[in-house]
Amino acid sequence: MHISALNSFLDFKKNYLTDKNSKIKIVEIGSQSINESIKNHLDKNHMYTGVDIVKGNNVDIVLDDPYKLPFEKDSIDVVISISTFEHTEFFWLSYLEILRILKPTGLFFLNAPSNSKYHRHSSDNWRFYPDSSKAL
């Protein structure tokens, strides 16, 4: 994980994950840890599940289908995706699945590069700009 992505997540956590008393269900999509993980920065009341399409550090569930998340509708408080959407062929299918599992008051933290160089990690399909977030 790039330091800028980690810092963005830490800002998100500081501003939005402020409840220290309630159990907060967090799902990270693309959770395989290469050099740093958000899991290391979560609080004791955060119930973390990491999902990815490959086995690895911080991967609790290996997905058979990257567009089907194994969670009930409206069951997750927070979904996090850091540097994953650019590698997802059909990111809009992932987005719809995220909306399905999020509680109505749930939060989605998306961090995706807009100006990084080509970096094929199975594939490199998209770049996201500020208007992308508004459109989603």
Regions found by a protein language model. Give the residues of each.
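Class I SAM-dependent methyltransferase Rossmann-like catalytic core
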Residues: 1-19
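Conserved phosphate-coordination/catalytic loops
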Residues: 3-4, 89, 127
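Short, well-ordered alpha-helical scaffold segments within catalytic/effector domains
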Residues: 6-10, 95, 130
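Hydrophobic helix-cap positions at the C-terminus of alpha-helices
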Residues: 16-19, 101, 136
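Conserved SAM-binding loop
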Residues: 22-119, 131
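Short, solvent-exposed loop/turn segments at secondary-structure boundaries
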Residues: 120-124
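Short alpha-helix
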Residues: 125-136
